């Protein structure tokens, strides 16, 4: 099975409250834990280990395990590598991916910095120590860059925009409206971005037009076509990459029927660049009861920044096949087209997390934690521009949407995790964690709405029907050949929470993310210690559709994207 992610280029709408998808909620809610080099080196299997500042975000009780105060700082270098291939259309019912291309992007980050302060109560039993801490840990890295493309002689992005524009009046899309006296009034180029179509006879009268449709019309990539006496003439469209042929037949409404096709092949290219990260700032308190039982609590403040930039280009292989007749202005030929979409999201939220760690006997540790849902406020900004070029540059056109902005609230899901760890004579450590996250509990709300806010009713229903539980399993090991040196290794995998419907049943997509890590640690006889870790994260395959299917019996292009993240992390710390 596979999932297809449609790009924002085809879903940019005027109604901002309808532009969010369940994948936005998933992107902003998912955790790909970073932390210290020690925790990364052990696969973040730290629920029952503790003592490390990277473990505090996984189990708050971990801060109480260390019988000392400490400070750590952790720089990180992450390399994203993406292998992308392109299929113009189905061949024999399946995609034929080719033209594989690799792109990489490197980013520096600081996935951990913080300190804990240990206070001895002086009691020989009961509560023997309290630890206070402030720690910032990275919980996701959005870095990624990709490019893909190929030859297509069947479908076109501009053609898909022509289909999306059907039903909207050309005058409205260019900034005109009808006043109370039924007169045509110029409202300005940006009018259709904020107001519904009000032309009297439009099929879409009262509807908001998609922003990408408006920009394509205003750039001159789309136009009305055919017999101007047809009743539907002013709200049917053809793209600059298309030609039409009159059949001589009419439909039931009296409009002539036309055959529309591409007159030649196009060279198409899609590219995407994503940067950003998510962090949790933790106010922590941990309680040590006789070195046997530990409790902890976090007040977590989540912050995220997500920057998404994508483009789509198509150019005529033989422009002379793409003749364009502009009437009295003359004729020219389509050359090339480019559209670009830029999107930024910033968010913050608050949650609570509570955990315990228990040593029933020497050498065995058991731990668990529960995290409340995070209530986040997300602030979005976006813009799209369109450029269309012809062999005669005097016909070239361009358009840019206004900068859109919108804010809403997202309730991310709760998390439960449990773990066990085994130590062997102070020389070796084995640990294993299980974490579950129920993404069906995600919920979108308007910024000022309450829990029963119905603004996102349909989207929240879709989340409940198509999202479920994601399972994460983490295992780690540490071996000390000498007291000062530690060798580490770890592995974890995370399953997708997404379901697909098959008849009356739902089946989980068979996708998962795998991560492999190794690490080394040095601990001096004094206060200084240092760790280094390397991790490879292999994300699940991604299938991208750069524009919607618009022909009944022919699919639009599909891109297969294979994504890997390589990271090198170093931690420098001092105990006091």
Q: Where are the language model's segments positioned?
A:
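Active-site-proximal flexible loops/turns
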Residues: 9, 66, 305-307
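Hydrophobic alpha-helical membrane-insertion segments
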Residues: 11-12, 68, 435, 442
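Bacterial Sec-dependent N-terminal signal peptides
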Residues: 1-24, 572
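Outer-membrane beta-barrel porins/channels
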Residues: 20-34, 39, 118-576
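Outer-membrane beta-barrel translocator/receptor signature
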Residues: 37, 49-58, 64-146, 150-153, ...
């Amino acid at each position: 099975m596979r999932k297809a992610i449609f790009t924002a280029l085809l879903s940019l709408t005027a109604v901002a409250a309808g532009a969010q998808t369940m994948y936005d909620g998933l992107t902003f809610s998912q955790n790909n834990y970073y932390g210290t080099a020690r925790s990364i080196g052990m696969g973040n299997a730290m629920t029952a280990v503790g003592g490390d500042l990277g473990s505090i975000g996984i189990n708050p009780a971990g801060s109480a395990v260390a019988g000392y105060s400490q400070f750590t700082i952790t720089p990180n270098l992450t390399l994203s590598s993406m292998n992308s291939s392109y299929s113009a259309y189905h061949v024999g019912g399946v995609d034929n991916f080719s033209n594989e291309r690799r792109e990489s992007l490197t980013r520096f980050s600081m996935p951990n910095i913080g300190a804990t302060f240990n206070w001895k109560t002086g009691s020989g039993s009961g509560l023997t120590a309290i630890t206070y801490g402030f720690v910032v840990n990275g919980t996701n890295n959005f870095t990624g860059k990709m490019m893909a493309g190929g030859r297509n002689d069947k479908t076109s992005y501009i053609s898909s925009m022509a289909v999306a524009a059907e039903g909207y009046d050309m005058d409205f899309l260019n900034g005109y409206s009808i006043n109370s006296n039924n007169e045509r009034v110029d409202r300005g180029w940006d009018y259709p971005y904020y107001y519904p179509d009000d032309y009297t006879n439009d099929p879409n009268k009262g509807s908001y037009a998609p922003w990408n449709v408006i920009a394509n019309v205003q750039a001159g990539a789309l136009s009305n076509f055919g017999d101007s006496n047809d009743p539907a003439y002013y709200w049917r469209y053809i793209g600059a990459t298309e030609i039409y042929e009159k059949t001589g037949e009419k439909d039931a409404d009296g409009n002539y029927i036309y055959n529309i096709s591409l007159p030649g092949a196009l060279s198409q290219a899609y590219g995407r660049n994503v940067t950003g990260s998510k962090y949790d700032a933790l106010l922590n308190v941990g309680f040590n009861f006789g070195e046997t039982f530990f409790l902890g609590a976090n007040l977590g403040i989540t912050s995220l920044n997500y920057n998404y930039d994508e483009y789509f280009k198509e150019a005529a292989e033989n422009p002379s096949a793409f003749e364009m007749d502009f009437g009295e202005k003359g004729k020219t030929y389509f050359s090339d087209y480019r559209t670009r979409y830029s999107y930024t999201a910033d968010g913050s939220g608050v949650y609570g997390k509570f955990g315990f760690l228990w040593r029933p006997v020497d050498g065995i540790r058991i731990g668990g934690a529960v995290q409340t849902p995070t209530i986040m406020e997300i602030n979005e900004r976006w813009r799209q521009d369109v450029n269309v070029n012809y062999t005669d540059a005097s016909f070239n056109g361009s358009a840019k949407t206004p900068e859109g902005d919108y804010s809403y609230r997202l309730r991310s899901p709760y998390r439960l995790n449990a773990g066990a760890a085994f130590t062997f004579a102070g020389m070796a450590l084995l640990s294993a964690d299980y974490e579950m996250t129920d993404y069906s509990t995600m919920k979108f709300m308007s910024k000022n709405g309450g829990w029963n806010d119905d603004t996102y009713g349909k989207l929240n229903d879709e989340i409940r029907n198509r999202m479920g539980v994601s399972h994460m399993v983490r295992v780690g090991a540490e071996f000390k050949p000498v007291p000062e040196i530690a060798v580490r290794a770890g592995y974890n995998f995370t399953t997708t929470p997404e379901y697909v419907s098959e008849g009356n049943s739902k089946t989980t997509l068979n996708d998962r993310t795998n991560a492999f890590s190794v690490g080394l640690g040095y601990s001096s006889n004094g206060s200084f210690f240092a760790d280094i870790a390397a991790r490879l994260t292999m994300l699940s395959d991604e299938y991208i559709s750069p524009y919607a299917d618009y022909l009944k019996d022919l699919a639009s292009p599909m891109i297969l994207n294979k994504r890997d993240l390589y990271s090198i992390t170093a931690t420098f710390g001092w105990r006091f």
